[in-house]
Amino acid sequence: MSDPTEFSPPPPTSTDLPPGWLEVTAMDMDAQGVARKPDGKVVFIDGALPTELVSANTHRKKNNWEQASLTEVHRQSSQRVQPGCPHFGLHAGACGGCKMQHLHVAAQVAVKQRVLEDNLWHLGKVKAETILRPIEGPAWGYRYRARLSVRYVPKKDKVLVGFHERKSRYIADMETCKILPPHVDAMLMPLRALIGSMAARDTCPQIELACGDTVTALVLRHLEPLSPEDKDKLRAFAAVHGVQWWLQPKGPETVHLLDEGGEPLAYGLPDFGITMPFKPTDFTQVNPHINRVLVTRALRLLDARKDERVIDWFCGLGNFTLPIATQAREVLGIEGSEALVARSRENYQSNQAQRQDGSALAATSFVARNLFEMTPEMLIADGASDKWLVDPPREGAFALSKALADIHQARIGAEDAPPLPAGHEGWQPPRRIVYVSCNPATLARDAGLLVHQAGYRCVAAGVVNMFPHTAHVESMAVFERG
């Protein structure tokens, strides 16, 4: 929920509006239209778009803001479009997976760009010197990863499979989902029928979807052991729909194939000749089309050279690490999970062995470390590097940015700076940092540290429309030593 202490909409351009009418002047990071009442109170309006004149029904009031739902549009935005999905909207039971289908895709990107710039300035007091061209891709059928909730409803004797309703714990009664790949969208109703036919229909709370370039995997979470008959039904479904079934009886570590064999899950990064095998519960980007462009753009901005050492922080399976290894002299991938580090090494070794153009990947090593507890001592222990790629989760890279800032503050003799660690004399900070973010607020916080305390400039920033029709803002920023 947005807060007017953090977000202040532009003033309305219309005056003397009829009673109850509101002029929407902005959209917040939750995809709500924002207006002001004549008394100055901010109103967040579900379903309203900038430039529209609307009426709305208030359902929550605070001292200086209200939350409301759109009831009527008196002047429509030129960017309003017909939603592509019948389950999108403000009606009872509407799906909560998307928030912006009523807004033209190009305008969605513009809203996300403004959200990024507003966060950088208001939270970090940072303004990028250059705005990068947005990274865009298909608006529909892009979501190759999804966690679908499952529920058997005894009163209706049917199974629901899909996302939750808007602002609700209930599962939407979905027959279709246009952001899923077409072949998965076509499976929704058959999946409902399959689960409904199983003895375990009321003990299967979730199906996780993971699509590779050629393989589609479905992970069935089941709270009780499956009967042989239920397993046979899964096999029959797999044969008809061309999917792999994985089973999850308990935690993520228990995930296993229903039947061994078959082609492994993998996605390619063809610009670098890299193939990335993965398991269905691994973190991979939701949108493979955008991921390919994102990796190429990030590496172009990083501009690693054959005489340079690069560190990839929060490296995961090596989505950026391995492409960097096609360009740099040496690469170090750092990740918080020992299991992911082991998998990264395997991916590196398999790609090294399968290089078809005769080139070799750079010397690359992987280490596990708690990246949320980084210190200046740990930075220096990892050795000097020319450039960094940083791709943290939503929590951001505060400890990493703070450690870099602490070293800089100590070197310039700032008051209250921590002492310099032993061995710092030969250590130099990276000349360039490319930061890929899935949360503009934590990016802005970290950018503030890098720019105001660590001696960097924010030379470029821009959005990546990884999740069309949602309010999620993916972005990237480039920092260079001042």
Curated annotation (Swiss-Prot):
User: What family does this belong to?
Assistant: Belongs to the class I-like SAM-binding methyltransferase superfamily. RNA M5U methyltransferase family. RlmD subfamily.
Q: Where is the active site?
A: 438 (nucleophile)
InterPro entries, per this entry? Answer: 23S_rRNA_MeTrfase_RlmD, MeTrfase_TrmA_CS, NA-bd_OB-fold, SAM-dependent_MTases_sf, U5_MeTrfase_fam
GO terms for MF: 4 iron, 4 sulfur cluster binding; iron ion binding; RNA binding; rRNA (uridine-C5-)-methyltransferase activity
* Record's keyword terms, sorted: 4Fe-4S, Iron, Iron-sulfur, Metal-binding, Methyltransferase, rRNA processing, S-adenosyl-L-methionine, Transferase
Which residues are involved in binding S-adenosyl-L-methionine? 285, 314, 319, 335, 370, 391
Q: What name has this protein been given in UniProt?
A: 23S rRNA (uracil(1939)-C(5))-methyltransferase RlmD
Q: Which PANTHER family match?
A: 23S RRNA (URACIL(1939)-C(5))-METHYLTRANSFERASE RLMD, RNA M5U METHYLTRANSFERASE
Which residues span the membrane?
Answer: none
Q: Does the keyword Acetylation apply?
A: no
Question: What biological processes does GO assign it?
Answer: rRNA base methylation
Organism this protein belongs to: Acidovorax sp. (strain JS42)
Q: Where does [4Fe-4S] cluster bind?
A: 85, 95, 98, 177
The UniProt catalytic activity note for this protein reads: uridine(1939) in 23S rRNA + S-adenosyl-L-methionine = 5-methyluridine(1939) in 23S rRNA + S-adenosyl-L-homocysteine + H(+)
rRNA processing listed as a keyword: yes
Q: What is its EC number?
A: 2.1.1.190
Q: What does this protein do?
A: Catalyzes the formation of 5-methyl-uridine at position 1939 (m5U1939) in 23S rRNA.
